[in-house]
UniProtKB/Swiss-Prot annotation:
Probably forms a complex composed of NirD, NirL, NirG and NirH. All proteins are required for the total conversion of siroheme to didecarboxysiroheme. The keyword Lyase applies. Belongs to the Ahb/Nir family. The gene is nirL. Gene3D superfamilies: 3.30.70.3460. It catalyses: siroheme + 2 H(+) = 12,18-didecarboxysiroheme + 2 CO2. InterPro entries: AsnC_trans_reg2 (IPR040523), HTH-Siroheme_Decarb (IPR050684), NirdL-like_HTH (IPR053953). GO terms for molecular function: lyase activity. It comes from Stutzerimonas stutzeri. The keyword Lyase applies. Pathway: Porphyrin-containing compound metabolism. Disulfide bonds: none annotated. This is Siroheme decarboxylase NirL subunit.
């Protein structure tokens, strides 16, 4: 698929995507207007980048603390390797789980291989949700820990583009 955007427009689009999609009924049309193009060309370029492996998906970075969700915890579990994919899929679809992913264990210090992020307004709410999640999935006896956030770090989307001046100055 050939790009209908020129090199400068493509780089501008990458920069705009790093800051997030506009809150608009047609966010890709809004992006197109900002770079002097049309929505169809923006969508074609994004599809091309996805096919090339520049990124796997377009997702949402939720600033949960700004919305009042201050009790944020990571549930870490030691799931048998033969079950981790299936359990991870189930937990990733569960109400209240914002993110679920597998990582390698770092034995002997870190025996956990499945991670679930949960946000809540109050700590007790998160604890209850985790207890129910573990019980409903037969995981209450699985080695696990619930790690609450103590501070927030900067949240941002992916970074894909070099500084714009490198493209302009060539």
């Amino acid at each position: 698929m050939n790009s209908c955007l020129n090199e400068l427009q493509a780089m501008q689009l990458r920069r705009l995507l790093e800051t997030g999609l506009p809150l608009a009924a047609r966010p890709y049309q809004r992006l197109a207007e900002q770079i002097g193009s049309v929505e169809e060309h923006v969508l074609q370029q994004i599809q091309r980048w996805q096919e090339e492996g520049l990124f796997r998906r377009v997702g949402l970075v939720l600033k949960h603390r700004a919305l009042g969700f201050r009790a944020n915890a990571m549930l870490v579990m030691d799931i048998p390797d033969a079950q981790v994919d299936e359990i991870g899929r189930r937990l990733g679809q569960a109400a209240g789980v914002n993110l679920c992913y597998q990582r390698p264990r770092r034995l002997p210090q870190w025996p956990y291989n499945l991670f679930c992020m949960v946000h809540g307004r109050e700590r007790e709410q998160v604890c209850q949700l985790i207890e129910r999640l573990l019980a409903d999935n037969g995981l209450s006896e699985v080695p696990h820990q619930l790690l609450f956030s103590t501070r927030a770090f900067k949240q941002c989307g992916g970074r894909f583009a070099p500084p714009l001046r490198e493209v302009v100055n060539g």
